[in-house]
C-alpha cells in the first residue's frame, strides 16, 4: 500500500527528459487508466521526486530507449520508491501531460526517433520547473450503458474516456474535471454507506465530512451501528 506515481519520459540515448511527474489519487492496485491523475504532484517530497528522476534516467539509458516511455512507481509511507512497470512506448497520459506542461511530447519524441537530440531541440534539463497551476485528469465510465460490468475498480481497466480540469486551486481543478466527465455533483442529499469491518475506522473521517456538510447518511446494519457509536446520525436500511 502506498502512493502511485507515474511519469512519461523521452530518451535520446544520451539524455532523458521528464516533462512532469503525475500523482495518482486512487489506491495502488487500481488500473492507472481508472485513477485520477494530478500534475504537479501534491503530496510527494522533493527527495522522492529526485529518486524518481534518477530511476527514470537510469532505466531509459540502460534499456536503450530512443523515444517515449512510461514508468509507474509506488511510494510507501517511508518514502521508499518501488517500480511497478516500465513501458517502452507512448501512454494514455501523454496528451494530458502535453496540455499540462506545454511540451508537445509527440513532436519531441518524433524528432528524437529521427535522430535529433534533446539538446538540439533546446531541452537541457531532465525536469523543468513545475507549473503553478493544478491539472487533473479523471476517468469517464460507462457503467450505465454497458451491462454486466462490475463497477468495483481493480487492476482491470474499465473506463472508456477521460476529462481534464485545471485551476490555481487543486480542489477547484478536481471539481471542474469531475463536471467535465459528466458527473452531477450534489451539495445536498443522501449518501449510502456500507463498509467492511477492517475499513470502518479509515472510512470514518470521510463519512463524517459528508455528515457535517448536511448530507443524510444511510447504511447497512453493521455500518449504521458503527456510525451511530461514533456520533453520526444514521438511518439503518433493512
Protein language model features and the residues they cover:
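Short internal beta-strands
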Residues: 214-226
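Glycine-rich phosphate/ribose-binding loops and adjacent secondary-structure elements
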Residues: 203, 224, 237
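Short hydrophobic/aromatic-enriched beta-strand-loop microsegments
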Residues: 231-238
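ATP-dependent carboxylate activation and anion-phosphoryl transfer catalytic cores
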Residues: 1-187
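A general structural motif
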Residues: 170-176, 195-199, 217-219, 238
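Glycine- and Gly-Pro-enriched alpha-helical subdomains that act as flexible
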Residues: 183, 188-190, 195-215
Amino acid at each position: 500500500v502506498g502512493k502511485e506515481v507515474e511519469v512519461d519520459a523521452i530518451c535520446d540515448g544520451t539524455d532523458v527528459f521528464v516533462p512532469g511527474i503525475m500523482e495518482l489519487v486512487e489506491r495502488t492496485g487500481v488500473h492507472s487508466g481508472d485513477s485520477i491523475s494530478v500534475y504537479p504532484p501534491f503530496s510527494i517530497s522533493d527527495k522522492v521526486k529526485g529518486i524518481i528522476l534518477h530511476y527514470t534516467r537510469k532505466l531509459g539509458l540502460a534499456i536503450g530507449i530512443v523515444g517515449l516511455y512510461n514508468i509507474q512507481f509506488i511510494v510507501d509511507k517511508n518514502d521508499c520508491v518501488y517500480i511497478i512497470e516500465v513501458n517502452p512506448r507512448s501512454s494514455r497520459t501523454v496528451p494530458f501531460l502535453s496540455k499540462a506542461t506545454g511540451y508537445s511530447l509527440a513532436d519531441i519524441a518524433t524528432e528524437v526517433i529521427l535522430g535529433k537530440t534533446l539538446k538540439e531541440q533546446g531541452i537541457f534539463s531532465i525536469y523543468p520547473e513545475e507549473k503553478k497551476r493544478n491539472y487533473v485528469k479523471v476517468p469517464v465510465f460507462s457503467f450505465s450503458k454497458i451491462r454486466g460490468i462490475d463497477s468495483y475498480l481493480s487492476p482491470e481497466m474499465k473506463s472508456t474516456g477521460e476529462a481534464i480540469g485545471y485551476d490555481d486551486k487543486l480542489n477547484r481543478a478536481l471539481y471542474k474535471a469531475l463536471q467535465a466527465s459528466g458527473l452531477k455533483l450534489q451539495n445536498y442529499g443522501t449518501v449510502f454507506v456500507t463498509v467492511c469491518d477492517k475499513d470502518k475506522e479509515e472510512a470514518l473521517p470521510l463519512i463524517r465530512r459528508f455528515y457535517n456538510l448536511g448530507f443524510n447518511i444511510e447504511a447497512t446494519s453493521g455500518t449504521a451501528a458503527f456510525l451511530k457509536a461514533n456520533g453520526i446520525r444514521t438511518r439503518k436500511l433493512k
